Amino acid sequence: VFEKRAALVPEFAKIICVTVAFVLDNGDVKKQSFSGKDEHDVLKQVQKLLDRCGKLDFYLCGHNLKNFDIPMLAKRMIINDLMPPSILPSYDTKPWEIKAIDTKEIWQYGSYTSIGSLDLLCACVDVPTPKDGEITGDIVHSSYWYDDKLKEIVEYCEKDVLVLIDIIKKLKELK
C-alpha cells in the first residue's frame, strides 16, 4: 500500500516534473516543463517562475489544483527548505483571494461526492483525452522508480496541461 500511495502523499512524495503553460493574448500556448531527478532543483525553478507570476495578474489553473497540486507543491517546497511563492494560497489566504481556476471544482458544481477525473471531464465535454500514451497517473510512481521513464512522465504531464487548456476554452465558449 505504501508503495502505491506514497506518491500521492506530500510527506513521502518526490516531485520530478512540473509543467506550466501560458495562454497568450493571441491564443498561442507557451508551455514549459521543469523536470529532473533532483527535486530541490526542479522546485527551485518552479518557485522562481511562480514568484514572477505572483507579481502579475495570473491565475493558476488545474484539475484538482486546490486539493492536490497546490498543497503538494507548497509542502514539498517547505520540505526542501524553499518558501512557497505568494501566488500559492496559504493558511491565511481568504477564499476570495485565491487566484486559481480548478476544473474539478467547476465540474463538481458544489458537490463533494461527485467523481471528477480529468478523463471523465474530457469525455463529458467532448475534448480528446490525453490518456493515450503508455504512462497513466496510476503508474507514474513505478515508471519513475523502476523503469526510469522520466521523459515519458514529462510527456504525460504536458498532455494533461494542454488538455486542461482545451477544457477551459471549451467551457468559456458555452452559450
Name these PLM-found stretches.
Residues 1-52:
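Conserved RNase H-like, two-metal-ion catalytic cores of nucleic-acid enzymes
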Residues 13-16, 25-28, 54-155, 159-175:
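Metal-dependent phosphoesterase core characteristic of DEDDh/y 3'-5' exonuclease domains
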